[in-house]
């Protein structure tokens, strides 16, 4: 499968999303390794809290997908599962996430996969459209500025955008030179 969902009961107080995460990361990886071999995404839920990551993502980096599209209000609680399914798992969006929004850093010591968060996804697409709209000769040549709070994943957002600039609309972007300057 390309995604694994592990659900825990919302009415049992002794089961949590952490239990769901442990089941995927320890039991499934140990007992059913072929299940996770080509799995890109994993979702954990206790009915009220739903989060997404990869089979390599530490629990603290699982996140909620709180919007179906960038114009909607944030949803949470019981509606969070429906929002995640509509927002991250619609056919077109799921293909986009798998193709452009999962990053596997080079690391010999452990397996790592960075999966986009919904603000990164929407920001990268919005910037892509803005860059296309401002290309010369019809536009002013300015791509714009992206501002994000500390810890919001700006570097990954720009990495995802760079991947799209380099691989999509080759007729428009014509082999762009991309320079990313980070402060670390």
Language-model-detected regions and their locations in the chain:
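ATP-dependent helicase/translocase motor core
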Residues: 1-182
